[in-house]
Amino acid sequence: MAHHRPKPDDRSDNVEKLQDMVQNTIENIEKAEETMQFASPEEREKIAEKNKRREEAIAAMRAEIKDEAAARENGYR
């Protein structure tokens, strides 16, 4: 059995990946809000709850973007 070495940690594009994830999540929120007008009251509540979780995820991703950008500035030390 061959020994596999783990891939080195490549964080060079983490900021860009996180920014894409934030943008995609914002688009998902907007699409969900558009569908709310056609949803039942129960579905509206579920959509609102999911969008709240999405907003929380965006806040966490933005904090991670700041951390990754700072790490990039410091040479990932």
From Swiss-Prot:
Induction record: Expressed only in the forespore compartment of sporulating cells.
Presence of keyword Repeat: no
Source species: Geobacillus sp. (strain WCH70)
Name recorded for this polypeptide: Small, acid-soluble spore protein Tlp
Entries under HAMAP family matching the protein: Tlp
Localization per Swiss-Prot or TrEMBL: Spore core
Keywords from the UniProt entry: Sporulation
GO biological process, one term: sporulation resulting in formation of a cellular spore
Family that this chain belongs to: Belongs to the Tlp family.
Phylogenetic lineage: Bacteria, Bacillati, Bacillota, Bacilli, Bacillales
Superkingdom of origin organism: Bacteria
Presence of keyword Oxidoreductase: no
Chief location category: other
Signal peptide: none
